[in-house]
Amino acid sequence: MRQVAYSTFTIIRILDNKMAHIIQFDNPATIVLRRGELFDYPKLTRVISGKTIWESTFPIEVDDVFIAMSDGAEYAGVGQELNFGWTRDSIADYAIANYLPENSAKSTASIIIDECNRLYEGRPGDDTTIAVARVRNRHPVNLVVGPPEHKEDDVRMMNLFFAKEGTKIVCGGTTSNVVSRYLHQPIIASLDYHDPEIPPISQIKGVDLTTEGVITLAKVLAYAEDFLDQAKLASVWAVQKDGASLIAKELFENATDINFFVGRAINPAHQNPNLPITFGIKQQLITSLADCLKRMGKHIRLSYF
């Protein structure tokens, strides 16, 4: 063995939400997608201690996607499905073919790494790392669950909830009634069960999504915990139309800032000792979900009433 220390690296910095600064050494060149097409960004070279460093600085645009990778990605398929491996250009073509403006950075990385794993036939011959960053505008989401502990606080809670900018999600039957009275709009119920385990969603004019409460949020929490692990269930909630899946997609992929409005009123049904532990006090459920969302990099604010 040569016993020589060796390291490749890719550094991507976003400066003042205006400029991208990329520094690269011996990794495949970072792929940048702009408006779904390959963006040929400027590159300068700098030699340090005999090593050539590539450096780039350029203005960013909303929805720019940065895809950095180790050389294991280029070696995927060598001697198996592909004679010369999966080249950077081929990886860029694959990313473009699978590009959707709404795709999160995580989903884009998963799409590419899954294809690498397929080309390696599940037996990677080299370290294979994909890192993705996406430039986006902030997207606030506001979620209210449970009525206030004191009924006289209903209007105050609703005033604060509807004063917030962003998507509005209402969880729980009693909460929906409070919102319905406040907006003077009827609740339009649905009997469409997209998932037999999740109660159907409803419609209230002025609200983006109306769902059942604890059962639905318990499922969202399960999805969140899985998402932070191996995201094996992401293929379920990404396409399903039940309340838990719709909330998961909004919170995990779309939201940047999430405001929870949590009523402290206790629903006696949730105190049934025969129900699983996830059906305990809703504050515990929301706290656990908020912790997961913080680990996803979301900005969280909890308000109790």
Predicted feature locations:
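Non-transmembrane, aqueous-exposed alpha-helical and coiled segments at domain scale
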Residues: 137-167, 176, 180-305
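Conserved beta-strand-loop-short alpha-helix elements that form
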Residues: 24-25, 59-82, 133, 171-175, ...
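Acidic loop->beta-strand submotif enriched in PP2C/PPM serine/threonine phosphatases
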Residues: 5-9, 40-79
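Active-site glycine-rich loop that binds ribose-phosphate moieties when present
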Residues: 45-56, 113-114, 149-156
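PP2C/PPM family metal-dependent serine/threonine protein phosphatase catalytic domain
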Residues: 28-57, 210-216, 222, 230-235
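A generic local secondary-structure boundary/capping motif
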Residues: 10-11, 20, 54-58, 117-122, ...
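Active-site-proximal, acidic helix/loop segment immediately C-terminal to a metal-coordinating Asp/Glu
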Residues: 65-115, 268-275
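Catalytic core of PPM/PP2C metal-dependent serine/threonine phosphatase domains
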Residues: 1-36, 53, 106-133
